[in-house]
Amino acid sequence: MNYPFQDIEQKWQKYWDHHQTFRTNTHSSKPKYYCLDMFPYPSGAGLHVGHPEGYTATDIISRLKRMEGYEVLHPMGWDAFGLPAERYAMTTGIHPRTTTKNNIDTFRRQIKSLGLSYDWEREISTTHPDYYRWTQWIFLQIYNSYFDRKQNKAVPITTLIQTLEREGSLFFEGVELPKGIQFTASEWKSKSRKEKEDILSHFRLVYEANIPVNWCEALGTVLANEEVEEWTSKGYSVERKPMRQYMMRITAYAERLLNDLSLCEWPPSTLEMQRNWIGKSEGLELSFHVPSLNKDITVYTTRPDTIFGATYLVLAPEHALVAELTTPEQTEAVGQYQKDCSLKSDLERTELNKDKTGVFTGAYAQLPTDPSVKVPIYISDYVLISYGTGAIMAVPAHDQRDYDFAVKFNLPIKQVIDGKMETNLAFDSKDSVCINSSSAEVQLDGKSYKDAFQTMVVWAEKKGIGRKKIQFKLRDWLFARQRYWGEPIPLVHFEDGSPKALSDSELPLVLPDLEEFKPSGTGESPLALAKDWLVYKDPETGEIGKRETNTMPQWAGSCYYYLRYIDPRNNDKLIDPELEKMWMPVEVYVGGAEHAVLHLLYSRFWHKILFDLGHVSTPEPFKKLVHQGLILGEDKGKMSKSRGNVVNPDDVVSEFGADTLRLFEMFMGPFEMSKPWSKNGVDGVFRFLNRVWRLFHSGENESFFVEDIEPNEAEQKTLHRTIKKVKDDIDSFSFNTAVSQMMIFINEFTSNPRKPKQVLEPFVLALSPFAPHLAEELWAKLGHTDSLAYHPYPKWDEKYLIDANITIVVQVNGKMRGEFLAPREIEEKEALSLAKEVEKAKPFWVGKEIKKEIYVKGKLVNIVVAG
């Protein structure tokens, strides 16, 4: 008879719910352990079998930690704002709030059916006003702050205002403030509200900017670069066009975001992805003079040592000087090219393997190191306006993209680094020296990369045409979306154009109910249609303003949810400071590698601002990060409806039980690797759990049976090895080998007629993190009246981990030729004698002169022979 998993699982899930077994006492005196999953977006499709993989892993860890005496915080919630729900509402007429609630109910039911030990009292949803009140509150904390360069941290904007009132713009002109914006303290005081706000916008960590964005007309919204591929693959077209958008000044934190990665125990690949995304480089900003305009083009280069190899300049199509540079003959071609580029995202434009395109402007610049040399000026989509200065000096001999472009447009290729050039390939080297690189202005020939770099910096700065600069690839965060289903931005615009941040007492700014979710057609979000909601009357002055109609991106709610879990029902503060100090940082964070950059970078950014402002006590939110591998279809392809290879966890739970699904997903292979689904594998794990059940039930009636007998040494060894390996493997996320060890245990005891309770009872505890329903049932049958959830994990005795016999390797002249078993305490003389009895080794030494016999205690014998 198979074990009755349906009855057992329903029974224990009801028990856990009724007794609130997994409720966290945040004020407990126990040591703390915060185990966090990346919370899911509750789609209409419900869970797929990929979701339980990560959730089961964190559940196993949480259950073990409770048994080890920790107070465990293990919560679950929903990242529920976003474009898919809004699109569904547009096609069905069903309000996103309704579909989101239904989807959450489905996800919650499915997750509960897996026996996951979440504290459901802490459940949150990013779409609930009680939650997004704090999203808006954090937004205002960021908006009302600026980055103080001297302190290298965020500071309230009121501090800056006091400085401007006292000292004017003395310390900021040319850095935060553009050159030419100068004023005294008295001049500041005389400025209008709008003028002051325009100046403050250069400092605030949230600001408005007119930038080229990815605009999707059909969706009626801006898409972030990372979203473009997703929606174009669904048939939507995207174009680039300038729009006024809210930005978050994440670039101010680039250095700290980079340096503090050293505090993170994260996968090396994820750390590297974040480093590359931040993209720190050291280079030279250098001006190229354009005689026809009597203006300069400033380029940024990380290789100023190659200046003499620059044979042309390339500007981004959006560069401000393009119109002035373009000659009448080239105007039509340049205009058409700019239009074509506006239809491409940054990701499309920078693909390394794509065909290079561009147009000559008709203008030339002078090479700074030799003004007699004229270099043509092109525009091309492989140069982005958002990086550096939006202009590059092209050195085709030593940069592959420049080389490909030069070949296509028949431009000169001049080698200036010593080395061998190969056909169709540029080459780069920082280990060689400069050649063909001297003029009356500057001499680089024979200099190393480092010396030539420094020579160029000194020369350019002395000439007043350049400066050394640290540059980052990281761009400020585009924070506005022209959508309905998102957090309203708590700002108001008055008629004079000046903004006002809502006060804390005016939060939450609740999303109004709308019947129409289609794009407004004006570039504004559907909130522009909420006429009554739009009108704002200042409670202090009575002044009438208009609410901001953009909403926040989906990333906003996930930037801090780990904090709200700690204190989810606090209506007065984001989080109680004492609880924050007790529970942060998160000990282990588990989720997909697809979030390696954006969510993790944005949440780190928000956390650092909250840290600077004194709201949190740790510089980083997540101590250890682990990514689960994908679960593929049985065809080894990614699961998708179109492939027809999606497996619904409800079906597996219905046929085999939740414990089977949990155990199988942990047994499939290494946790962090991708693995194909296997129906046969599920069957195998189900058979294993039935064997566990039958081990405790015997006779014709399969009645429960264990014996109060003393275990023998062999039984003790099997047990103690199992409980140690299971514990160690859980700690190292090696769940598959932990399951293998439990299978070894069952194999050995299935063939053993003895059923010693002293061995079987600890095994149930070791099994419980993986198969909690079955373990709870067996625990109760063993005579216990309480749940095993908080029972101490069994301890192992080292003496049972030591084998009486060991394997000793036999070498001849250092090469392995055989091995033999021997007592652990074997003496050298006996070991040498037994080594000579190993038949496999004899052909390599018998009949030869033995020069030496070496014994390495407990490991090997090496017979050294002549010849």
UniProtKB/Swiss-Prot annotation:
Its main location: cytoplasm. It is found in: Cytoplasm. It is an enzyme of class 6 (ligase). NCBIfam families: leuS_bact. It comes from the Bacteria. HAMAP family: Leu_tRNA_synth_B. Signal peptide: none annotated. A motif ('KMSKS' region) lies at residues 638-642. It comes from Leptospira biflexa serovar Patoc (strain Patoc 1 / ATCC 23582 / Paris). GO terms for cellular component: cytosol. ATP binds at residue 641. The gene is leuS. Coiled coil: none annotated. A motif ('HIGH' region) lies at residues 40-51. Its EC number is 6.1.1.4. One of its GO terms (molecular function) is leucine-tRNA ligase activity. Gene3D superfamilies: 3.10.20.590, HUPs, Isoleucyl-tRNA Synthetase, Domain 1. GO terms for biological process: leucyl-tRNA aminoacylation. This is Leucine--tRNA ligase. Belongs to the class-I aminoacyl-tRNA synthetase family. Keywords: Aminoacyl-tRNA synthetase, ATP-binding, Cytoplasm, Ligase, Nucleotide-binding, Protein biosynthesis. It catalyses: tRNA(Leu) + L-leucine + ATP = L-leucyl-tRNA(Leu) + AMP + diphosphate.
